[in-house]
Regions:
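ABC-family P-loop ATPase nucleotide-binding domains
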Residues: 85-143
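Conserved ABC transporter NBD signature motif
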Residues: 59-69, 76
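Conserved structural motif at the start of ABC-family nucleotide-binding domains
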Residues: 5, 20-22, 137
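The feature captures the beta-strand-to-loop junction immediately N-terminal to the Walker
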Residues: 36-38
């Protein structure tokens, strides 16, 4: 099976402290993983690496055959479906549910003044309907329950058909 994610001797160091230390990890396209550990163990850091939001201090991270540091992450990000509580904190609370899902097609969080393609808006509405969230399309993200926010994050993650 081809690897969708490969960490080789990955180290992430902050203030002379290893947050992640010499991690080797491979994920093939037929696998599903859960990342567990105590607070401060580096779970969020590992997921930020996998979502191209962070580069390792040393070692290599390869995602979908593209090595971080040697590829344009803005072209890679739309191919990655990712949902997390950390991502939810980056969503402006006044952002509509439709825009939270729609902006995934452009690898951004938060709508500014951009104009988005009609085809992407139609896809976002279809994804919302598939996840039974279409009735929330015009609601703001900050007014949703935690459960609704999590479902919107999943819809956002599948928006790009990763």
């Amino acid at each position: 099976m081809p690897q969708v994610l490969e960490f080789s001797d990955v180290v992430v160091r902050r203030n002379a402290r290893d947050i992640v230390s010499h991690l080797d990890w491979e994920v093939s396209d037929d696998q599903r993983w859960v990342v567990l550990g105590p607070n401060g163990a580096g779970k969020t850091t590992v997921l930020q690496l996998a979502d191209t939001l962070l580069h390792p201090t040393s070692g290599s991270v390869t995602i979908l055959g593209e090595r971080l540091g040697r590829t344009d992450v803005f072209e890679l990000r739309p191919r990655i479906g990712f949902a997390s509580s950390a991502m939810a904190r980056r969503v402006p609370p006044e952002e509509t549910v439709l825009d939270v899902v729609l902006t995934a097609a452009y690898s951004v969080t938060g709508r500014w003044r951009e104009q988005y393609d009609d085809i992407d808006e139609r896809r976002a509405l279809r994804v919302l309907a598939e996840w039974r969230l279409d009735h929330l399309a015009d609601r703001t993200f900050g007014t949703l329950s935690d459960g609704e926010q999590k479902r919107v994050q999943i819809a956002r993650a599948v928006m790009t058909d990763p």
